[in-house]
Amino acid sequence: MKLFTTVSLSVALVQALSFGSLNFGLDTFANRIIKTGPEHYELVSEATKIQYKRQGKKFIDVTSVVSIDDAVAQGMVASAGKSDVVTFFAKQIKSVKKPIPAYNYPTNASTQKVVQPLLKQIDLDRVKSNLGEFSSFYTRYYKSSTGLESADWLYGTVKDIVSVLPADAVELTKVHHDGWDQYSIIVSLVGKSSDKVVVGAHQDSINLLFPNLLRAPGADDDGSGTVTTLEALRLVVAAIATGLFTPHNTLEFHYYSAEEGGLLGSIDVFSRYYANNNTVVGMLQQDMTGYTKGTIDEGVEPHFGLISDYTSVGLNDFIKVIVAEYCSIPYHETQCGYACSDHASALENGYPASFLIESEFKYTAKQIHLTLDTLDRLDFGHIHEHIKLTVGYAIELSLAKHL
């Protein structure tokens, strides 16, 4: 067994190395500033970031927000000196904290006549086909050429979906980031108000064994969240195109680059929103929406995992209203720690955010970040429930006034 494993790994490495066009970034010793908790910053190398990911240690890479020189000058971190791998802890800087407004979210669903007809049009064959395409890229690692190719495929798919809308009803944006080629994608369905309702998912994948070399299909993490929100986008766009629905608040669907690098894409997006004084009344992250074997094996009913730590209580309560009204499974509250997905980037910039995952955290897929994160392991009936939730959230909150 050991020999077989060694040979298999060697073959995989040879195959990966033969992909000359992959063009992986190998800036292993570049210094980065990461935030590992509300009051902790560290100066680390890229190699240390990967090690932290392997250990399950969560963080936000804030290097694009605060330069290393400024961080040292402000006392956020100590100078790295001659070491590229030494980590440093520092106190929270008050200027980095941004208060989160309290909104008066609806306490009852009120748009059933719009939402219910759309839920009957969910096309799981389309969802499965999209995920098959998306997870077929060798990797969607944000520093790889195939990570850029997968972003191009996703952009083209989104562009086709919104092509039925008039030009003044939609804005489609590629958000380019400094330091890597994979871009984030923002679809903005223009409302009467510039206040934003955001649905998010991350498009990248990673193989933590050898990120620069090995295949990372990322079917569940986060291909499932991506196709969940793609189908919700298709249904919402169809409702707008047919006159069934016109958003009051501007409704946005975000597909973030480089979540696996420390929420790099989303922290860039929401930092720009903050700098431009944009208002976001709610952000819902869908990251891993398709795995139920962990719950079923333990004799637990399939359910949503509603993250209760480092999320917005008021928005979570609104999500509970949506689950009760439009979904066939319950939610279980669960915790995932600081900065466990892109909703943390919204919170860091003073925007209310929630995160819904496939189950309680202890039952979620364990094969993520490996070659084993494949489509055949997923439950599309469960993804169906996440789509229903996303459509309900998007329409109810985008039609809510006087928040």
Which functions belong to the PLM regions below?
Residues 17-102:
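Primarily auto-inhibitory N-terminal propeptides
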Residues 1-18:
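Fungal secretory targeting signals
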Residues 113-122, 135-146, 173-175, 211-222, ...:
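Second-shell loop/turn segments in exported
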Residues 291-403:
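Active-site-adjacent substrate-binding region
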Residues 181-183, 213-314, 318:
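Acidic/histidine-rich catalytic neighborhood of metal-dependent amide-processing enzymes
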Residues 126-190:
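A non-catalytic alpha/beta surface segment that caps or lines the substrate-entry region
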Residues 86-144:
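N-terminal hydrophobic or amphipathic helices/low-complexity stretches enriched
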Residues 127-135, 171-174, 184-188, 196-201, ...:
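Structural recognition of the beta-strand scaffold that forms the well-ordered cores
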